[in-house]
Amino acid sequence: MRFILPTILLSLATSFAFAQTEAPAPDNAPLSQCEKFLDGMSLLTPDNDYAVRDIPDGCIVSNSMYQTGSIMGWTVERVIFELDHLQDFLSELPDFGKAAPTWGRIAIDGVRMRLQSGNKVSDYITSIQQWPMDFTAFYRFNPQSGYLHIQNAEINSIKFGKASVSAEINLPVDASIASLAANPTATLSSLRLRLDNQGLWESLVLPVLANYAALPSETGEEDPETDIARLRDIVSKSVEAMPDSQIDTKSRKALLNFIRDMPYPAGFFTLDLHFDNPMPIGLNDMEPSKIAEHALAAAKISVTYRVR
């Protein structure tokens, strides 16, 4: 499950142009503005006791499902998302020439994986082994300067720990919703990652990394365990080769220890990246290899790592 943070947050501000297609409501009852919006986006599907409710500048969705494949999905107890003047953008004649909303918030509660393998025993065992996860994020945006601050986007589980990301991003000055939807490019000035790992890394991040690492490579390997070990060696050598002006001795040691402990980095990890020349980012720049390549080449890096 990929979490491409800038894209997720900006999509709430740029996807309204594609959310105006109406579908017939059951019993000819008119759809609410939030129902029309969600129907047009086609991101969430109804689960048992599904409900949608409009709130000022936002929507609440209860008991939905996000499908990620033919045999796997994620059930969600509740989603709350709010945007500055959201109801204006959900009107019959929205003005997409306006600047993007200056603030937005999303809270996703009770996320659990649901297996749909066709084997009732396997699906049941998987369901009772799930622990709920919650996700929250908040952003502020200044259209005049193009400054976008993603504040503490956090995923949290009472069982697996938590991880949070914050970032400072620069968008085109005075960009409209329409222009951002047509050309979603930006530059990244800083990125902060916090991880309290008690299994969260292995449950969410590692499957994505394994899927990426298992792609056919120059070694000819397609086994994720082998290729993750290969990537671990490559990244370690890259960190060792970084100049002291980019990472100090203490941070270098902490980062190498974190990499060494893969795939089970049990403990507290912090990573701060700062770019003197902001790094260009776009929808085509979100692959792990590209992010790591840019970060290792251009960012000033500060790291702490404490084993639990």
What label would you give each PLM region?
Residues 1-5:
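Positively charged n-region of N-terminal signal peptides that target proteins for export
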Residues 6-15:
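Bacterial N-terminal signal peptides
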Residues 20-308:
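Glycine-rich, small/hydroxylated-residue low-complexity segments
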